[in-house]
Amino acid sequence: MSSYANHQALAGLTLGKSTDYRDTYDASLLQGVPRSLNRDPLGLKADNLPFHGTDIWTLYELSWLNAKGLPQVAVGHVELDYTSVNLIESKSFKLYLNSFNQTRFNNWDEVRQTLERDLSTCAQGKVSVALYRLDELEGQPIGHFNGTCIDDQDITIDNYEFTTDYLENATSGEKVVEETLVSHLLKSNCLITHQPDWGSIQIQYRGRQIDREKLLRYLVSFRHHNEFHEQCVERIFNDLLRFCQPEKLSVYARYTRRGGLDINPWRSNNDFVPSTTRLVRQ
């Protein structure tokens, strides 16, 4: 269990509690979680973070009424900047989006502006929102993570408790390599409910070569680990930077959706540009 799982900042969350579903607009349903909760134990300070990045959200269950009462549907794309004070708690995000269902808006841009304003207020940071009509996305191919998949290794694993021990002495030689490694075996659990979170992860780096067996064992050790998606990605970035000391590093995870939302955080210390096309399990 994470050291901050019982922190008072989490006590008021609706996550893990019985809730009413409201279908008229209510911005107060949104709840934020301080990023400092997981950054402080990692020694990460807001004014000197070793990375930049965003939390990319896809909103699949977004609907409202137009001015004449006709329902509208869209797919939303939200990017929340890494410098925001809070991350957005996903169940509260779902409840908030449900509150649009029977609410009239004059036009699509009013919906977009409302989302941007409310999410920015909750996160206390920069948020961008784009809305897409369904025909704009129809026929879009399933994406994939570029890189070498490290999953098909003939190894025995019997430990699923999180540990950084696998990253000790995980690099070898003095030769500098530049490679992209991919795993689809990332599984962690919600910090509050302990429900499973399934994801694929892409690790791009330049530096001494990382032992792929040790890296895979490290990633599999998240299997019983309880943390939010964004926190796991920052932990992985921080651990790789600390133990493997690459010159350049980017970590990008795309998680399967829950409640009509998927969360796709990335962190990088270079000019990494994430792909935004959904993966096969999304």
From Swiss-Prot:
One of its GO terms (biological process) is tRNA modification. Pathway: tRNA modification; tRNA-queuosine biosynthesis. It catalyses: 7-aminomethyl-7-carbaguanine + 2 NADP(+) = 7-cyano-7-deazaguanine + 2 NADPH + 3 H(+). Its EC number is 1.7.1.13. One of its GO terms (molecular function) is preQ1 synthase activity. NADPH binds at S90, K91, R258, G259. Keywords: Cytoplasm, NADP, Oxidoreductase, Queuosine biosynthesis. Homodimer. Catalyzes the NADPH-dependent reduction of 7-cyano-7-deazaguanine (preQ0) to 7-aminomethyl-7-deazaguanine (preQ1). This is NADPH-dependent 7-cyano-7-deazaguanine reductase. It comes from Escherichia coli O6:H1 (strain CFT073 / ATCC 700928 / UPEC).
